[in-house]
């Protein structure tokens, strides 16, 4: 049987090598080259030379707006009285973009939208929650990272809140529904988004990236 097998390998050596090389190439491609030209540009250059990855998103479907078209001060939808004070309830808006930098001290993420860079301000505790990385502790004592910070360069997010001057401040009311932050896992060809509001489960630690 081994002689038959050896003869078959000898006769088909070139085809076998071509098939093997093709499979190795595809495995490496899937591992290292997932995404598109725009995502590669962001990963390597930190800017888009071609179209923004989110340029074809169905903005109407997700209620996404252009930050720079919003009034510089938030619009008051209604007010309610709390003691002697009148508390405003603001109209909330959503924007989306690609994270290009962050300031841990100020709990700020710099978001490259399709119309420009926006400074997005989070509450400190909320920022810290999504800036950490989750990991799994292995039996040999080593750690396997499950998910890094949502605010690392290249990650795409949707944020909900208000414009205040030159800054977008994330906000959510109990009555508003939804979340103030979503991670964009995938952009589909029809303009739909695969969104996620929860962190990947695992132990947490400081991300270690500025």
Predicted segments with their positions:
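Noncatalytic, beta-rich nucleic-acid-contacting surfaces in large DNA/RNA-processing enzymes
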Residues: 1-210
